[in-house]
């Protein structure tokens, strides 16, 4: 199979993976409207083509939180990576490290902090949820700090799990889920051999380390689902801000006023994100939400963004809309499921090449030159006319 884009990795991953795993990463909440709009809205953002600009000394390098990045991209937190490739978190982290960009370990990773951190030279980032069990949160933070994690990504848009209907149909949840998953696994031999047999243990490494016993998918659905905390407020984050020494990023911002609150709180960064369309269907796509948020807080706080980004052109679009750096999610997971570390490495090379093409043809020699001026104006403020009413309606 020829791999020329993330979409090729998606098709390959669908063939390799048992349906419960493919649809878990590929699906979204409710009718998946926001999941679709994340991709479609971003694809409609029009860039200005510029010519005869002497682009021979183009550079993608940037700096974030005093870290040098080879390009304004990081691998975002994705749960259960180790179910998609053998010790998947380690493989993805190694690919990111080799490319000179950060890797973010999820709270609900298969590989624990202590397995991933020593496998790479660059300090990794760590993502944490707000859970009722504050003892687990403190334990995870202490272990992340001891492992040398540099940046904390604090996810706040999951006070309760989203309604993901695909999961019930695919076997991730629903009636007879365990038996359905087993039958799917044995009919997908490549995955069964590489991950099912040779990728063990399949427990949730960070949670097992705290509970002192093996965990699995039932704990992911049960213990974790019962521990999300709908009572969370900004005040609950204060002890974390005091405890954590490094940069703290608030993930799950879609409204300018919440972005301003993050600045007032003292966060170092925010992630403009709707959780990849996996939480509340019908909310703004990240591409729609980003311009108003950038208007509100650009320069006061680092702005990261995710959701809907599938290639290097999308990265350039997001930066033009106001992001400083973007996080990859599904795109790298498709590649990981298809070809492990080599797949993620190839995807990052593709994204870098696509960014260079987009920057060359828009006349931006550096990341700092990708601005609102890189967008076609007159179609609506920073967005095509079809998107502008939503963006204006969300301005605060």
Curated annotation (Swiss-Prot):
Chain ranges of the FMN hydroxy acid dehydrogenase domain: 1-380
Assigned GO CC terms: plasma membrane
EC number: 1.1.-.-
Residues that coordinate or bind FMN: 106, 127, 155, 251, 306-330
Keywords: Cell inner membrane, Cell membrane, Flavoprotein, FMN, Membrane, Oxidoreductase
GO biological process: aerobic respiration; lactate metabolic process
Active site positions: 275
Keyword Transmembrane helix: no
Protein name: L-lactate dehydrogenase
Function: Catalyzes the conversion of L-lactate to pyruvate. Is coupled to the respiratory chain.
Enzyme class: oxidoreductase
Reaction(s) this enzyme catalyzes, per UniProt: (S)-lactate + A = pyruvate + AH2
Cofactor: FMN
Topology relative to the membrane: Peripheral membrane protein
InterPro entries: Aldolase_TIM (IPR013785), Alpha-hydoxy_acid_DH_FMN (IPR012133), FMN-dep_DH (IPR000262), FMN_HAD (IPR037396), FMN_hydac_DH_AS (IPR008259), LldD (IPR020920)
Residue stretches in coiled coil: none
Compartments in which it is found: Cell inner membrane
Similarity section: Belongs to the FMN-dependent alpha-hydroxy acid dehydrogenase family.
Chain residues that bind substrate: 24, 129, 164, 278
GO molecular function: FMN binding; L-lactate dehydrogenase activity
């Amino acid at each position: 199979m020829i791999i020329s884009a993330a979409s090729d990795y998606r098709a390959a991953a669908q063939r390799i993976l048992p349906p419960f795993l493919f649809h878990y990463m590929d699906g979204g909440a409710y009718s998946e409207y926001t999941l679709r709009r994340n991709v479609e809205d971003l694809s409609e953002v029009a860039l200005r083509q510029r010519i005869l600009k002497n682009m021979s000394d183009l550079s993608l390098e940037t700096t974030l939180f005093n870290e040098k990045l080879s390009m304004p991209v990081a691998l975002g937190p994705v749960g259960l990576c180790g179910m998609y490739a053998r010790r998947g978190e380690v493989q993805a982290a190694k690919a990111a490290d080799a490319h000179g960009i950060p890797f973010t370990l999820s709270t609900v990773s298969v590989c624990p902090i202590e397995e991933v951190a020593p496998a790479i030279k660059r300090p990794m980032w760590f993502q944490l949820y707000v859970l009722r069990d504050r003892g687990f949160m403190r334990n995870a933070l202490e272990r992340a700090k001891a492992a040398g994690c540099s940046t904390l990504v604090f996810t706040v848009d999951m006070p309760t799990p989203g309604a993901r209907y695909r999961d019930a149909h695919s076997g991730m949840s629903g009636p007879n889920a365990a038996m359905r998953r087993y039958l799917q696994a044995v009919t997908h031999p490549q995955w069964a051999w590489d991950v099912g047999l040779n990728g063990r243990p399949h427990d949730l490494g960070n949670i097992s380390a705290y509970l002192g016993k093996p965990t699995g998918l039932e704990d992911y659905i049960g213990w974790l689902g019962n521990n999300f905390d709908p009572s969370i407020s900004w005040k609950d984050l204060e002890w974390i801000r005091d405890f954590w020494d490094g940069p703290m990023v608030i993930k799950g911002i879609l409204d300018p006023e919440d972005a301003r609150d993050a600045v007032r709180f003292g966060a170092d960064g925010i992630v403009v994100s709707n959780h990849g369309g996996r939480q509340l269907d019908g909310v703004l796509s990240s591409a729609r939400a980003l311009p108003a948020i950038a208007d509100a807080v650009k320069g006061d706080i680092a702005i990261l963004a995710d959701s809907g980004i599938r290639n290097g052109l999308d990265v350039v679009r997001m930066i033009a809309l106001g992001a400083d750096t973007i996080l990859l999610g599904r795109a790298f997971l498709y590649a990981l499921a298809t070809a492990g570390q080599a797949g993620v490495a190839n995807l990052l090379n593709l994204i870098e090449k696509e960014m260079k093409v987009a920057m060359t043809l828009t006349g931006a020699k550096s990341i700092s030159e990708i601005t609102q001026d890189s967008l076609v104006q007159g179609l609506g403020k920073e967005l095509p006319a079809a998107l502008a009413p939503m963006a204006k309606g969300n301005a605060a």
